């Protein structure tokens, strides 16, 4: 099978351009990303254990989806309809291009079972209803995710998505002044308000946000919702990078500098907007100057000379 496919294009290009790997694999860490990609190249099905592909237990069986407007264009352009991978992004329910509701076909997305070849031209109807989304925020989010989906996958960055997101809330009200405490409940509240017109009001809850920040869970739509809310450009998500220094490091450096300038702990605390104990704690962790000990040296005493001098004194007395 691999040899037949490679006659058309290289296997790595086929995976990046014609599978869902860029959607599910983009936010995996470096090692898992490479492992999943190699699994797809080798076609050993091990990628299912690595990639965060959701198991649709509540919703039941998943089916391939299509956009009625895309199908019409395909028929006029190519003579037949076909499936688009951009319509299979779980969590995105409208076409990113035409903003109409995606329709469900009769072709199930199977797992370990053998599937029959279902030609899209015979499955996708000509008269499917076209329902345009009336939610601007849903359209904006779908386009944001689609733009990211089209980008190349970076295999070199060591930065995890959790680390990246932490850096993006630095300097905001969602992180303490020192940068060591996240206010996730406040973030969740603002996310709900920002996405209140999103159909089904699907916003990541507090527990999921915590897991995403801690690199314990990957949910593509939730990550994109968070990034779009924080104003992160799509380009920055294609190659994750961190600032030279964290907010915590910058805060501590400033506190130390102010201390060296002669300010007292309480003055520094008041200036930086934290409690005095926080500044004192930073001061304790700073290396102290080593004390310089001096050793007094004495000339070596001549005991014989001292005895002779002592005897002479006694005679004269």
List where the protein language model places each region:
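Basic, alpha-helical nucleic-acid-binding regions used in initiation and control of genome expression
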Residues: 1-317
């Amino acid at each position: 099978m691999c040899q037949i496919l490679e006659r058309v294009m290289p296997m790595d290009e086929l995976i990046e351009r014609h599978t869902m790997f860029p959607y599910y694999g983009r936010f995996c860490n470096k090692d898992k990303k490479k492992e999943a990609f190699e699994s797809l190249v080798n076609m050993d099905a091990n990628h299912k254990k690595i990639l965060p592909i959701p198991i649709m237990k509540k919703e039941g069986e998943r089916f391939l989806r299509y956009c009625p407007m895309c199908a019409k264009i395909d028929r006029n352009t190519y003579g037949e309809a076909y499936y688009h991978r951009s319509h299979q992004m779980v969590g995105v329910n409208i076409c990113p291009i035409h903003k109409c509701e995606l329709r469900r076909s009769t072709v199930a997305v199977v797992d370990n079972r053998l599937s029959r070849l279902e030609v899209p031209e015979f499955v996708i109807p000509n008269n499917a209803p076209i329902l345009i989304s009336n939610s601007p925020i849903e359209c904006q989010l779908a386009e944001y995710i689609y733009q990211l989906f089209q980008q190349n996958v970076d295999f070199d960055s060591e930065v995890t998505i959790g680390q990246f997101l932490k850096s993006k809330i630095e300097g905001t009200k969602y992180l303490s002044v020192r940068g060591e405490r996240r206010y996730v409940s406040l973030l969740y509240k603002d996310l709900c308000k920002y996405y209140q017109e999103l159909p089904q009001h699907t916003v990541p809850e507090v527990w999921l946000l915590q897991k995403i920040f801690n690199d314990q869970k990957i949910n593509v739509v939730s990550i994109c919702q968070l990034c779009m809310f924080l104003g992160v450009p799509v380009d920055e998500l294609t190659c994750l990078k961190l600032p030279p220094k964290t907010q915590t490091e910058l805060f501590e450096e400033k506190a130390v500098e102010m201390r060296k300038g002669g300010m007292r702990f309480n003055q520094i605390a008041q200036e930086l907007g934290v409690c005095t104990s926080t500044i004192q704690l930073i001061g304790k962790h700073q290396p102290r100057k080593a004390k310089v000990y001096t050793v007094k040296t004495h000339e070596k005493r001549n005991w014989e000379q001292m005895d002779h001098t002592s005897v002479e004194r006694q005679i004269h007395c």
